[in-house]
Amino acid sequence: MEGPEIQFSEAVIDNGRFGKRVIRFETGRLAKQAAGAAMVYIDEDTALLSATTAGKHPREGFDFFPLTVDVEERMYAAGRIPGSFFRREGRPSTEAILACRLMDRPLRPAFIKGLRNEVQIVVTVLAINPDELYDVVAINASSMSTQLSGLPFSGPIGGVRVALVADEHGSQWVAFPKHSQLENSVFNMVVAGRVAGDDVAIMMVEAEATDNSWNLIKEQGATAPTEEVVSEGLEAAKPFIKALCDAQADLAARAAKPTVEFPVFLDYEDDAYAAVEAAAAEKLAAVFQIADKQERDAASDQLKDDVTSSLAGQFEGREKELSAAFRSVTKHVVRQRILKDQIRIDGRGLTDIRQLTAEVEVLPRVHGSAIFERGETQIMGVTTLNMLKMEQQIDSLSPVTRKRYMHNYNFPPYSTGETGRVGSPKRREIGHGALAERALVPVLPSREEFPYAIRQVSEALSSNGSTSMGSVCASTLSMLNAGVPLKAAVAGIAMGLVSDQVDGQTRYAALTDILGAEDAFGDMDFKVAGTSEFVTAIQLDTKLDGIPASVLAAALKQAREARLHILEVINSAIDTPDELSEFAPRVIAVKIPVDKIGEVIGPKGKMINQIQEDTGADISIEDDGTVYIGATNGPSADAARSAINAIANPQVPEIGERYLGTVVKTTTFGAFISLTPGKDGLLHISELRKIAGGKRVDNVEDVVSVGQKIQVEITKIDDRGKLSLSPVIAEEEGAENAEVAEAAAE
């Protein structure tokens, strides 16, 4: 875009051998009636417009800052027409909602405290390269437009995604990676922060291991995202954030409006705080030593009523100030006790975890279920399995068009003992579900290993701190109960942070397994999920202007100790996948030649419909010739497989068939027998006893050797088409072998 009115600045992001990215900030041409507007480009082929506006008057009756952040995904940005019935954009996609949360979380603490004018930030995706991710660009765009708007905002704020990408030269943290680069990465994180002196203070982190992480680490030797590696990633993000903040500051210095003086409504005046502190501080210290949440809340509410009633005459008409001051005094009392005495609200030490319980198979008929409890937080996880054609279809700007693992999180009002609206999920529920989903994706089996669509639902039945991390634990239990062969168990823990001035110095205390009150009164909610070996997901929210990376690194190490303890509890409840529920569908995969797909389908679908009608199975065929067969029971699935093989794979072996095979390989656990070209089966070492006349076989080579011909029968075909064999022994030969074995024994 060109024009004499345009002013711009650029941030050049140097990724070394992975090339450079250019982030360009422009203003002056578009959305001129907004308080602040900015166009932000990445490499000139992805463009976002951010506009910030503010209400002219404070919102009456509001005791919070009314900030709204929205993302408008335009399908024309990717050269597409929306897939909805009316062919226009409707409600925001999940990706857009998550992008809104990414922007809101670092921006909100940067506005002046007490602002009550409504502020709205709208980011519109105008053009996008399908290989780009726009969410981090949106963080910078929203910060830039707000910097230009004249609002009391302590920016700029820079946001960057860094991915640990592996290539032939090793692993490197790459800024602003593309979708194609993420396929070779083991971990990626979105980090937002601001320049604080000579350092960068971190304000928000959203991180995850990728679905390829396990294979890259275990099979290709890629660097695992341990706590130390993740800490290095936070440090690697700092210079990129500084470059983005410098570019924003440069443009703001030339084009920003003067900061407007907005009315600020402080929660209370100093005299109200002093009066409440004198009346309540000592009693609050005793109240917040009560361990039980409901008893503690009742005592706190009673004390609040007593204090406000006693001070009502002195502060007539200022009851709201007294209420806010009471909360502030409570916060100070709780924080000082933690920092000075190292004792928390419920009497725990800084690193102590509440009592844990884990139970599986808690509901009848469902495919998998579990309950995980951590103190007063109780999560029920329920797993449902179905054919892959039931996976979620996605119509968004992302190149990802389908998702086989779907995690839904529900937070009903009764979970906190309150009343409220129930129904469609709110942004918070969508965000928590997405976090739990990201934590578990790296350990899911591949589509080939487990050809099922998986829907996981987390029901927050009781909440007192970190239901999202409880959902991760409950989901691990539930999926194992459903028979999902997870590569490893995953657990999550919520860390908190308290900081305050003690004896003239700023002290930090990291808290393990925070309560709801510690979340409310603390400075940070830091959620960490992972296996026993590495981190799979992180989410950081802070109420401060930023947190030193060294403090976060220490909290990461503290979280690992807690995670390992929780994994022990999970493993004591269930450590291996159970058998599939009798109520779960049986899904098997058959590979057919691509040129046989038409024959299986038949003219106008006649053949495939006939097979489905005859067997009761449900059949779907992929373009690569993979056929997925789903049925309510095993015999139906086997009948459909036989019918398909009769058409497309007439030489495919069936159970009970006999072959004269050739030993092609021996191992410690048996011998592989070639039956037909391209089709082998396993003759397990336990089956070799029949050849040895019932004698125990310790060494496979003592009985068979490579190249030997042997008559075998197919005894089993598993869901992946692998064959189990048994030797066919004539009666005379079997008797003779038995006599030889007896003679050898004598």
Swiss-Prot record:
General function of this protein: Involved in mRNA degradation. Catalyzes the phosphorolysis of single-stranded polyribonucleotides processively in the 3'- to 5'-direction.
Protein name: Polyribonucleotide nucleotidyltransferase
Organism: Arthrobacter sp. (strain FB24)
Enzyme Commission number: 2.7.7.8
Recorded name of the encoding gene: pnp
Cofactor(s) this protein requires: Mg(2+)
Entry-linked InterPro entries: ExoRNase_PH_dom1 (IPR001247), ExoRNase_PH_dom2_sf (IPR036345), GPSI/PNP (IPR014069), KH_dom (IPR004087), KH_dom_type_1 (IPR004088), KH_dom_type_1_sf (IPR036612), NA-bd_OB-fold (IPR012340), PNPase (IPR012162)
Record-listed Mg(2+) binding positions: D519, D525
Example of a GO cellular component annotation carried by this entry: cytosol
Localization annotation: Cytoplasm
Family: Belongs to the polyribonucleotide nucleotidyltransferase family.
Entry-linked Pfam families: KH_1, PNPase, RNase_PH, S1
Predominant location category: cytoplasm
GO molecular function terms attached to this record: 3'-5'-RNA exonuclease activity; magnesium ion binding; polyribonucleotide nucleotidyltransferase activity; RNA binding
Domain S1 motif: 656-728
Keywords recorded for this protein, A-Z: Cytoplasm, Magnesium, Metal-binding, Nucleotidyltransferase, RNA-binding, Transferase
Catalytic activity field: RNA(n+1) + phosphate = RNA(n) + a ribonucleoside 5'-diphosphate
Limits of the KH domain: 585-644
PANTHER family: POLYRIBONUCLEOTIDE NUCLEOTIDYLTRANSFERASE, POLYRIBONUCLEOTIDE NUCLEOTIDYLTRANSFERASE 1, MITOCHONDRIAL
Biological process, per Gene Ontology: mRNA catabolic process; RNA processing
PROSITE patterns in UniProt: KH_TYPE_1, S1
